[in-house]
Amino acid sequence: MAFSDFSLTVLGSRGSMAFGGEQCSRYGGDSSCYMVRAGEETVFLDSGTGICAAPSSYPKDPVVLLTHLHLDHIVGLGMFPALSNRELRVKIYVPFCRTREEAEGSLGRIYAPPFWPVRLTEYTSSPELLPLPDQLTLGALQIDAIPGNHPGGCMVFRLRYEGKSIVYVTDYEYEESSFERLVRFAEGADLLLFDAQYEDAELPAKHGFGHASAGQGIELMERSDAKRLLLIHHDPQSFDRVLAQRETLLTHKKVEYARTGQRIVL
């Protein structure tokens, strides 16, 4: 990778829980994790099981941004290879916290005995657990965060680098005022990632579950003038044949369902 690149790699795009087997071999079964490279900066969006396949070394200390703390978005963190690299100091930004102590306590409820053998702060890389700010600057990479709409809360991210931008909207349920805010937040994005766990017809029965559909993602893409849409957070029961069938019904050339291993260079 040239250090001037701005890219996103899908390490996992399954929602709610990971699911393996041949029926998930095309789109992947690992839960939410996306690796963004911006020059020498590396940022991971969430840390589901997909982060277990991430590299162990980086040009600079990697950063993990968590949208929320539901298990499917943090369950891979304990097996993140970089945490065992003593030459790195991983920074993990935790939402809905005001202090380092709150950030450590939030993840410490899971990553500590008896649920996990060691605390995250005891790993070789001595990672820093920090409260997630509304804005974060990493070299030339600018990151903004706003709240979405999901039970318990979930953050939405926009990453800007050298005139290009990625917007990450996972675990989002349509609500008029928050959707209007998303339209403004995603304006002109080069790549929009959007939760499409359900089909439009399923949404009434899934009200309150905190997820969206491809149709709503396309509406956001069109209203915000985003250039490309990647549909994410696949339902555990939406196997390859289901997602492939849904993909054949898409009429937009710049809309597709995410696949594990897929790399998009902006």
Model-found features: residue ranges?
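Cap/insert and terminal regions of metallo-dependent hydrolase folds
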Residues: 174-261
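Binuclear metal-dependent hydrolase catalytic cores
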Residues: 1-167, 182-183, 243-266
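Short strand-loop junctions, especially beta-strand C-caps/beta-turns
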Residues: 95-97, 171, 234
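Active-site flanking residues adjacent to catalytic metal/cofactor-binding acidic residues
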Residues: 45, 67, 169-170, 194-196, ...
